[in-house]
Design a protein with these regions (language model features):
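N-terminal strand-loop-strand
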Residues: 1-37
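Short, flexible micro-motifs
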Residues: 36, 42-43, 147
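Short hydrophobic-aromatic micro-motifs
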Residues: 20, 141-144
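Buried hydrophobic packing segments
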Residues: 8-10, 146-153
Length: 163
């Protein structure tokens, strides 16, 4: 698998919810104020699953031992095609207490996957201005790469529930 990054789509419940983080709005970063799945660059010696689990721990205090990995459900392009990102689908093994664990994240929470099934519309992002996406509860804005990935996750989860 030719990828350089990985994200963890940690899903639970009925209706299905997925864990997201918001990249801190108080730092000067390309990703500032973006809603994202926990994830990042693959380090030497890691595979996509190991990367996704490490990043979930680093960004949201979700310990790898509390996660059941269901598999890699696809690869998506990000950063205008410069990154190839593996999407790792998982579910919690039991109760977890996710919360921001680094200065790069200022929010961790669960969003209902039903929020991404409609048609995207123009919404105002705190840093980027008007983008095509979804306004989520709490004033979060979902758009771009994470929106595409969560639409794939929602379709995959729906198919698995119907099987």
């Amino acid at each position: 698998m030719d990828v350089d990054s990985a994200v963890l789509a940690l899903v639970w419940g009925d209706p299905a919810r997925v864990l997201v983080v918001r990249k801190s709005c108080s730092v000067d970063s390309y990703w500032a104020c973006d809603v994202a799945l926990p994830g990042g660059s693959i380090e030497v010696g890691e595979d996509p699953v190991a990367t996704a689990l490490r990043e979930a721990w680093e960004e949201s205090y979700v310990h790898p031992s509390m996660v059941e990995v269901l598999g890699v459900i696809g690869v998506e392009s990000a950063a205008k095609g410069l990154r190839r990102v593996a999407v790792v689908l998982a579910r919690p093994k039991g109760p977890i207490d996710p919360r921001p664990s680094s200065s790069e994240v200022d929010f961790v929470g669960w969003i209902n996957l039903d929020h991404v099934l409609g048609e995207p519309r123009e919404v105002r992002h705190p840093r980027r201005g008007v983008v095509l996406g979804f306004e989520l509860p709490g004033g979060l804005v979902l758009w771009g790469f994470t929106m595409r990935v969560l639409r794939r996750v929602a379709s995959t989860v729906k198919l698995r529930l119907e099987a």
